[in-house]
Amino acid sequence: MTNIRKTHPLMKIINNALIDLPAPSNISSWWNFGSLLGLCLIMQILTGLFLAMHYTPDTSTAFSSVTHICRDVNYGWIIRYLHANGASMFFICLYIHIGRGLYYGSYMFQETWNIGVLLLLMVMATAFVGYVLPWGQMSFWGATVITNLLSAIPYIGSTLVEWIWGGFSVDKATLTRFFAFHFILPFIITALMIVHLLFLHETGSNNPTGIPSNMDMIPFHPYYTIKDILGILLLILTLLTLTLFSPDLLGDPDNYVPANPLSTPAHIKPEWYFLFAYAILRSIPNKLGGVLALLLSILILVLVPMLQTSKQRSMMFRPFSQLLFWTLIADLLTLTWIGGQPVEHPYIIVGQLASILYFLLILVLMPTASIIENKLLKW
């Protein structure tokens, strides 16, 4: 008799995706982050669901309802902080996952890569609308500043902003619709994630060498299930350590002050995971230019497969490209730091130089280095 997991219509799908899936025998721990992202998504949906049971999306009670969750709901404090810090873990895994894709040339699976970029945009949108919900000072002013950027769009800008606000300022209507978006987006992300996996399983996984591994595959279970469990345990340990020892480490103290449209915080800044893009936005002394640079800083990922000039897929055997890749990482860390600093003398110029270098590395320097490496292969 054939095994039920190979014949049952539903079990068959799970079997082909998680059990009998042929996987390259040499994929490293950098390939763990896909499953960790799935775990983060499940965790965020579950903690978010329990938070939504007690939260009220109304300007007069939103802040109080979050306080009520932390003080009066059984284990409400840990659910709230797991959700807030879970978002940070989500972005850490996301950025490492993208970095892995860039380093090892996984972007050559174009459909998988493009859906991945779409997933990134969706997760960023979800995190942004979610940050508005506690209705603290940074929630309110962050929402005001970022939605206001749309007014830079010629002709329809101001109408668009008022349409998103549902009025003439960020108010009750804005909070209600942001809560609705924050609830629906994770389910759209889940659907996209399934499509992402569908396209990945059409081609099979890449591996650190970038060389096809069709002749050397091993079953996903037990090898990579065990490996993933180790990653999951480390992720949960990190998240629990952060949540139980310093839950507010990555948050902004200003968000413990209820939203007040009459008082602007000294420094308006988003959560740490948006700071690199925020720094690029601020580096351009023109509203429309800044908005375009902000968009391009993310959408440039779509161009990466088209900029592939190397004969080798992975950077494993390309020292020049490796140097430029790590320069890009250092540049992104610099931008993240600049985004959190006030707009003052040394920071402005450093931010502008880091922004120029970011685009220069991806669009010019890395493709050029690849061409030079191709020539060196002939020596």
UniProtKB/Swiss-Prot annotation:
One Gene Ontology biological process: mitochondrial electron transport, ubiquinol to cytochrome c
Pfam families hit by this protein: Cytochrom_B_C (PF00032), Cytochrome_B (PF00033)
Cofactor: how bound: Binds 2 heme b groups non-covalently.
Membrane topology classification: Multi-pass membrane protein
Keyword list, A-Z: Electron transport, Heme, Iron, Membrane, Metal-binding, Mitochondrion, Mitochondrion inner membrane, Respiratory chain, Transmembrane, Transmembrane helix, Transport, Ubiquinone
Heme listed as a keyword: yes
Family per record: Belongs to the cytochrome b family.
Protein's name according to its UniProt entry: Cytochrome b
Organism: Neophocaena phocaenoides
Lineage of the species this protein comes from: Eukaryota, Metazoa, Chordata, Craniata, Vertebrata
Gene label: MT-CYB
